[in-house]
From Swiss-Prot:
<feature type="binding site">
    <location>
        <position position="38"/>
    </location>
    <ligand>
        <name>Zn(2+)</name>
    </ligand>
</feature>
<protein>
    <recommendedName>
        <fullName>Large ribosomal subunit protein bL31</fullName>
    </recommendedName>
</protein>
<dbReference type="InterPro" id="IPR034704">
    <property type="entry name" value="Ribosomal_bL28/bL31-like_sf"/>
</dbReference>
<keyword id="KW-0699">rRNA-binding</keyword>
<dbReference type="GO" id="GO:0046872">
    <property type="term" value="F:metal ion binding"/>
</dbReference>
<feature type="binding site">
    <location>
        <position position="41"/>
    </location>
    <ligand>
        <name>Zn(2+)</name>
    </ligand>
</feature>
<comment type="similarity">
    <text>Belongs to the bacterial ribosomal protein bL31 family. Type A subfamily.</text>
</comment>
<dbReference type="GO" id="GO:0003735">
    <property type="term" value="F:structural constituent of ribosome"/>
</dbReference>
<comment type="subunit">
    <text>Part of the 50S ribosomal subunit.</text>
</comment>
<dbReference type="Pfam" id="PF01197">
    <property type="entry name" value="Ribosomal_L31"/>
</dbReference>
<keyword id="KW-0689">Ribosomal protein</keyword>
<dbReference type="GO" id="GO:0019843">
    <property type="term" value="F:rRNA binding"/>
</dbReference>
<dbReference type="GO" id="GO:0006412">
    <property type="term" value="P:translation"/>
</dbReference>
<keyword id="KW-0694">RNA-binding</keyword>
<dbReference type="InterPro" id="IPR002150">
    <property type="entry name" value="Ribosomal_bL31"/>
</dbReference>
<keyword id="KW-0862">Zinc</keyword>
<dbReference type="GO" id="GO:0005840">
    <property type="term" value="C:ribosome"/>
</dbReference>
Length: 71
């Protein structure tokens, strides 16, 4: 391999909004990352059905299109 053409691959501490933290490796260049959902709180892995609403997108959609008549 050619030297010094590849990005640095460092350890990163990832923190989920549910409070779960874990360490992985990344080329992102940050020491810490924040994520909205992880395997501890994702509905597929937990078996619990819920709507993952980031920043009120579902409410915004219902507000915008909820009053429309069916065609």
């Amino acid at each position: 391999m050619r030297q010094e053409i590849h990005p640095k691959y460092t350890e990163v501490t990832v923190t989920c909004s549910c409070g779960n933290t874990f360490v992985t490796r990344s080329t992102a260049g940050k020491k810490e990352m924040n994520i909205d959902i992880c395997s501890e709180c994702h509905p597929f892995y937990t078996g619990k059905q819920r709507i993952v609403d980031t920043a009120g997108r579902v409410d915004k959609f219902k507000k915008r299109f909820g009053g429309m008549k069916k065609i």
